[in-house]
């Protein structure tokens, strides 16, 4: 019984840490995912990284639409990660190109990513911008939902009725 309580405490603490450091788990709405997927132009073999992937809903949507694209997500909140791992196990043939990792989004190197998703709270942007310096390929697209990155001009802004705005940046802004 004590093991169960310790396990639950660890899961809750990981959720609290994720919420305080970047964002609480809040899955992207299906309509928001569809709108964004309709804009993506991915080629076989390209790589998508989701920093703060939660339950992987965005990665699984990308994998369904682009089955030849490699999708990797990072998060530190255990409950959504367990859901993502379970989904991957249940549908392993469909999601063989999806990789879900326990890891701090601020410590990931995105040099090999063609697209980097950042769907977080704006309060973490200063730390995020510092952590991504030199870790994003110049030709990558960095896709940010809801709030623009401070003091940076997006290459493109996507707006649709009833959906959160999406800001698309090029990786060159992280090179300086």
Model-derived features: where do they sit?
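S-adenosyl-L-methionine
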Residues: 1-43, 82-110
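Conserved class I S-adenosyl-L-methionine
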Residues: 44-54
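Conserved SAM-binding loop of SAM-dependent methyltransferases across substrates and taxa
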Residues: 55-67
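Conserved SAM-binding motif I beta-strand of class I
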Residues: 70-75
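A short SAM/SAH-binding and catalytic strip from SAM-dependent methyltransferases
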Residues: 113-127
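C-terminal substrate-binding/active-site "lid" region of AdoMet-derived donor-dependent transferases
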Residues: 124-176
């Amino acid at each position: 019984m004590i093991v169960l309580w310790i396990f639950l405490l660890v899961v809750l603490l990981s959720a609290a840490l994720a919420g305080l450091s970047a964002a609480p788990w809040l899955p992207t709405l299906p309509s928001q995912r569809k709108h964004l997927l309709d804009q993506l132009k991915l080629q076989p073999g390209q790589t998508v990284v989701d920093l703060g992937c939660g339950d992987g809903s965005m990665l699984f949507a990308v994998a369904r639409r682009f089955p030849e694209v490699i999708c990797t997500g990072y998060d530190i909140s255990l409950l959504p990660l367990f859901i993502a791992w379970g989904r991957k196990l249940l549908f392993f043939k469909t999601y063989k190109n999806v990789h879900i990792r326990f890891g701090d989004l601020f410590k990931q190197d995105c040099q090999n990513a063609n697209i980097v998703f950042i769907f977080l709270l704006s309060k973490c942007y200063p730390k995020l911008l510092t952590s991504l310096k030199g870790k994003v390929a110049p030709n990558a697209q960095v896709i940010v939902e809801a709030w623009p990155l401070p003091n940076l001009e997006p290459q493109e802004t996507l707006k649709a009725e009833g959906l959160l705005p999406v800001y698309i940046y090029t990786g060159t802004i992280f090179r300086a």
